[in-house]
């Protein structure tokens, strides 16, 4: 269970700030491109990565939530979890361990590896987006 206060904070403060700051950075980038100012374009990349990543990560996070959520998955996802981790409980344990090990701010992720056709667990620092950082397709994110 995640409290309403935590969800409100994540939506109204964190996610909204990432979107607003990304919009500002994209506007500055457009101006730099129009001027041919490559130095400014390069200088804006960290802000675009951080705020764009925060927007992407939180957008995925919202899709992972449900008022009636919880419990083990069924169907193809259940089969993939059992194949790649042994059981849903083992997946939970590994996800928790990887997420807790993140130093400072970051994300624990369950992702799909298109090259191997397998599920993998990964962590990303700060707001680094999973797919851009690891190539994995994000399925479930834990904000830490």
Swiss-Prot record:
Entry GO terms, CC: mitochondrial matrix
Binding residue positions for Mn(2+): 10, 58, 143
Enzyme class: oxidoreductase
Major localization listed first in the record, in broad terms: mitochondrion
Pfam family, one: Sod_Fe_C
Compartment(s) of residence: Mitochondrion matrix
Keywords: Manganese, Metal-binding, Mitochondrion, Oxidoreductase
Cofactor detail note: Binds 1 Mn(2+) ion per subunit.
Record field: catalytic activity: 2 superoxide + 2 H(+) = H2O2 + O2
Gene Ontology MF term list: manganese ion binding; superoxide dismutase activity
Coiled coil: none
SUPFAM superfamilies reported for this sequence: Fe,Mn superoxide dismutase (SOD), C-terminal domain (SSF54719), Fe,Mn superoxide dismutase (SOD), N-terminal domain (SSF46609)
Cofactor(s) this protein requires: Mn(2+)
EC number per UniProt: 1.15.1.1
Protein purpose: Destroys superoxide anion radicals which are normally produced within the cells and which are toxic to biological systems.
UniProt record similarity statement: Belongs to the iron/manganese superoxide dismutase family.
Subunit structure: Homotetramer.
Protein name: Superoxide dismutase [Mn], mitochondrial
Species of provenance: Petromyzon marinus
